[in-house]
Amino acid sequence: MDAVQTPIQAIRSAVEMFVFACFVNDAIGTNRITLNNFNQQTKLEDDGKGLVIKHGFTDAQLKADGRNLVLMALASTALATDKSMDVVYGDKYPDDTSELGSARAIMYQIRCAFAHDLLVPIWIPKPKYKHTYRVTVNVRRESGTTTPRTIELDMSTLGGKHLSIADFGNFGGYFGLLEYCFQKVQSDPKGNTAYPLPVEE
């Protein structure tokens, strides 16, 4: 596994994995990846003897796993982006409803929703985050152009509800939010600083 070295690389790697998951899911859905592509076992190599995993899939399981792969990869983009923004900008301030503050708060709440349940994400904002956050992002079109889209979340109304991609502008809005955050990280010198290792408490 390649080590992530900077906040910029962290976001890029997570987005790359999300895009990869989308392509895999599409290939499964269009039968370009089928049960015939899989062996009945695989081996995870490590410094020891490795681990052999034996498993058989059904067609329904394969399709469900493809969709879940996309969902989990999306969660990883929120986690990587939230942490990268923390590395570059420091602690978040829930009362900050500026565009940057809103982008950070929205990304953090998406991250937290997945943390509560990875496959069934739920909004559970803390009271201090129950503000309305608003940020305008650029959504890419097939033509190569972009159009502005405003993402607005009133966190006081979302508590306990299942997260829906429509809550933050669908996939176009979410990719626009990722791009907004990435550009902020990329434009700051700290975006190229060493990505901190976890600290034991």
Q: In which residue ranges do the predicted regions lie?
A:
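Histidine-centered, metal-coordinating catalytic motifs and their short helical/loop contexts
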Residues: 101-126
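Short, contiguous, well-structured surface segments enriched in hydrophobic/aromatic residues
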Residues: 26-102
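Amphipathic, Lys/Arg-enriched alpha-helical patches that create a basic surface
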Residues: 13, 17-30, 73-88, 131-201
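N-terminal, charge-rich interaction modules
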Residues: 1-41
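Intrinsic-disorder/low-complexity coil detector
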Residues: 93, 120, 124, 147, ...
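Short, structured coil/loop segments at alpha-helix boundaries
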Residues: 2-5, 97-104, 170
